[in-house]
């Protein structure tokens, strides 16, 4: 899973061991920065189960303000770009690009106020 940084790493190693020269990863959604507090669809029990939050913790420490977390959710911010690069490096991907939340919302065609985006941007 790209969410926790577990299974996909093993799959990547399998691909390289099977002769792949490069592994390019394109997840179907933006990076998850906040655990779902509404549906509990993830097996994650702590925000630190999320690879994004572990990277933020390594960079910023444990008591990170909401403002800093929100900056990591902005795909044009330096923090976001460096977080994605760190995920790519840790997972040994040749490249990693996430969908942008604004593009995802636009493609769904539903008013943003009717969509839950909490796990991506922390906005309730």
Language-model features, listed with the residues they occupy:
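PRPP-associated nucleotide enzymes
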Residues: 1-124
């Amino acid at each position: 899973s790209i969410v926790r940084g577990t299974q996909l790493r093993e799959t990547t190693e399998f691909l390289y061991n099977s002769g792949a020269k490069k592994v390019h990863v394109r997840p179907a959604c933006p990076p998850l920065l906040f655990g779902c507090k509404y549906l509990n669809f993830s097996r994650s029990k702590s925000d630190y189960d999320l690879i994004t939050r572990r990277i933020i913790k390594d960079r910023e420490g444990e008591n990170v303000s909401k403002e800093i977390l929100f900056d990591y959710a902005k795909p044009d911010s330096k923090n976001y770009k460096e977080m994605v690069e760190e995920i790519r490096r840790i997972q040994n991907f040749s490249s990693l690009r996430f969908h942008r939340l604004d593009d995802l919302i636009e493609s769904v065609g539903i008013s943003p106020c009717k969509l839950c985006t909490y796990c991506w941007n922390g906005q309730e």
